[in-house]
A protein has these predicted regions:
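A short beta-strand motif characteristic of beta-propeller blades
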Residues: 1-3, 38-55, 89-95
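Beta-rich, blade/repeat-based domains predominating
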Residues: 2-15, 52-67, 97-110
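Solenoidal tandem-repeat scaffolds enriched in leucines and small polar residues
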Residues: 12, 21, 32-35, 41
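Conserved beta-strand positions in repeat-built beta-propeller and related beta-rich domains
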Residues: 21-27, 72-76, 114-120
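Short coil turn/linker residues within repeat-based beta-strand modules
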Residues: 26, 36-37, 47, 77, ...
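Short loop/turn segments that connect beta-strands within beta-propeller blades
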Residues: 33-37, 84-88, 126-128
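Blade-level signature of beta-propeller repeat domains, shared across WD40, Kelch, NHL, RCC1
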Residues: 100-128
Length: 128
């Protein structure tokens, strides 16, 4: 399976039979179907190379399905956003960890764990 698409996929999560992908290059969350990738959040842009590394609150990285919504980490912000996979709406900030760059996230035994890309460490959200 191959696609002619300029995506920079970082995170992915399965929700309700669909695969959601974070694409920081195109500033979007996308849903994967067998025939194509459809944008479900963000803006579809063809960013020139001088804007690729512009970091703002709409460049998603990590993605985790949890409790009927998706949790999404935002590049260089230390924020975990709540995201409604049915509507594409951001539901607000779930947590903020100043000075951290949150990548992949997982839930284990009721606790949120994430990779701090800046420090290169696995972190436990509660009791840090």
């Amino acid at each position: 399976v191959g696609y002619d698409y300029q995506a920079r996929i970082h995170g992915m999560a399965e929700y309700d039979g669909r695969m959601y992908l974070t694409d920081w290059y195109n500033k979007s969350v996308q849903v994967f179907t067998p025939s194509k990738m459809e944008i479900v959040f963000g803006e579809e842009t063809h960013i020139t190379s001088d804007a690729v590394f512009k970091y703002d609150d709409i460049q998603p990285l990590g993605l985790l399905a949890y409790g009927g919504e998706l949790l999404m980490s935002v590049q260089k912000s230390g924020k975990i956003q709540r995201y409604d996979p049915e509507t594409g709406d951001l539901l607000g900030v779930l947590a903020e960890f100043p000075g951290k760059e949150i990548g992949r996230m997982e839930i284990a035994r009721g606790m949120l764990y994430y990779i701090d890309l800046k420090a290169g460490k696995l972190m436990k959200a509660k009791g840090e």
